[in-house]
Amino acid sequence: MGRAILPTTYSRADAIFNISRTPLVIEALRSGDLDLLRKVMDDKIHQPYRLELISAGVKAYQVAKEFGAVALSGAGPSLICFVEPEKAIAAMTSIMAAIEEQGFVARGLITKPSMLGTHTI
């Protein structure tokens, strides 16, 4: 369903908007620059469409934006929020509350980035 809602074509401006941010996202993740990440995580290719599929998504997205850089992740109804470690619990709790206030069950997970790259666990 996540991919089915996407348009079959996009404007040149929207494609350029997304593509031009790719190196900045990589640099923000590499350097840990959360201010830069907050600025470059907006998207015009799939977020506006997929957010509609997540019943509590718009509210959760708004709450998450208060804590850090947010983007829809994958083809399913998941949100990812990059925040400073000291804000992680508050961000997760607030996002889950926003989802649960709309009558849905929410599950949160706090992780840390791995510098190992792809590997077998």
Residue positions per predicted region:
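Glycine-rich, charge-dense phosphate/pyrophosphate-binding loop(s)
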Residues: 18-19, 29-121
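Anionic-ligand binding region
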Residues: 1-28
